[in-house]
């Protein structure tokens, strides 16, 4: 660290500073010219739907599963889009030899059109989805699909293209016995599509079965959930619906990042946020209500620690079956704002060890000064990283990288803060997908000065009473 002393570094960090790391007026890794686009993207994501992909072999029960999910979620919130709608129209030459056309091959689908429609729906635009006629082998009519909370995509090869998989928040594979699927296919194609049984069996042995083995079954590994017996598995479908309902009640970023947790909002929490965000709130009230909120965040964060079952004898002589939480724990505060969260952690965890990290950039060359004082055995502990504001995410990344370099497993870090900007959430969660983030609210984004908006100003200055005003 050259001639700079630790005292000088802490003094520098005590002056007015922003939540992100800055170099020559620019946020590290993000140019100001791109700020509006980034902020806009973070706002768009809050309008994006929860996308469920349902794949599996032909006649495995995918449509039945989708219908049951829709019925339990209420159809006004859900739209079903079938991959069959995106078959290519057959040419005259292909129509003349239609029985030799492989409808179960990835090339039979217009994947680009599907991606285009999904992109528009994710941007809040209505789209026209084609309706494929299996008697004429053409799309002659369209149906208008409006943006909605939940989009269910269904199709045999839905997981084949990685670009389509990337759109999905949940991937379900319906697994049904091959004989059952064949019997269903014979019934469907002869009764509904007017085909003769000989043609159906010939197509099954020539195209359907090889396609399942070559293209469909290998994509089973991408599924988040595998449902045996399709629509007959009511327990699995009930669990899926419960999970979807939970996700619908969460902030949209929580649907994308499963390790992001926003504590349940109540009028008490909203009221405390109103007070600490108010520029006219006195220092005494700001500290009082900040401490209350910090305590709630810390308690919620502790709930994500591993535990073991434990039985105790109560004063009445009865046995109580409870849990025993992880004892190998420490806190690490990011100087200076993070120190405001230490008292709440000590109040919740008697005698807990707390380390400190200082990350600061100064000068035209953007030299980074880092000071750290951490427990010697930190690699053996679960770590609660304390910083009340997650802004650009760059300071958090530096702190997390330091912890990992000290041997702390990524999955052992829980990052606690009061408010988070979507940009910071993206940066941290994409780089460290196993880290848990616990926050009390997610704000709109960052302004041109890289401050969280609506935000609460410079937290450290307001909490420790070092405002320049």
From Swiss-Prot:
Co-factor binding comment: Binds 1 Mg(2+) ion per subunit. The magnesium is bound as Mg-PRPP.
UniProt-listed SUPFAM superfamilies: P-loop containing nucleoside triphosphate hydrolases, PRTase-like
Cofactor: Mg(2+)
Region: Uracil phosphoribosyltransferase, residue numbers: 259-469
Residues the record lists as binding uracil: 457-459
Ranges where the record places region Uridine kinase: 46-249
The protein, known as: Uridine kinase-like protein 4
Organism from which the protein derives: Arabidopsis thaliana
Lineage: Eukaryota, Viridiplantae, Streptophyta, Embryophyta, Tracheophyta
Name of the encoding gene: UKL4
